[in-house]
Amino acid sequence: MYTLYGIKNCDSVKKARQWLDKHKVEYQFHDFRVHGLTPEQLQIFIERAGWESVLNKRSTSWRQVDEGQKADLNAEKAAVLMLANLTLIKRPVLVAGEQLFIGFNAENYQTLL
């Protein structure tokens, strides 16, 4: 079974859930706001996709991050920031076995069928 990580009211997460439901793909939904995220879970995302892909620099949350924290960012500092503010993680994150998908893209999800 796959796990879809995100926030219930996020538009991209809604699209991903609708796509998975429509194509009858079994998955478990993990809401960051309800269940949180462990450092180990985030580390898996970072190892498979790279911290630059996981960190959402387009989010309103990113714009609120102090400039000092943005300077000299690396994987370790980014992980600390993302764990402190889960809305900095690009959504949704779909873990499908060894595959990991960041953001919703129907063409990429098609490979699951």
Segments the model singles out, each with a brief description of its role:
Residues F32-L112:
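Thiol/selenol-based redox catalytic cores and closely related redox-interacting motifs
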Residues L20, L112-L113:
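Alpha-helix C-terminal capping segments
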Residues M1-Q18, K22-H23, Q28-F32:
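Local sequence-structure signature of Cys/Sec-based thiol-disulfide redox active-site neighborhoods
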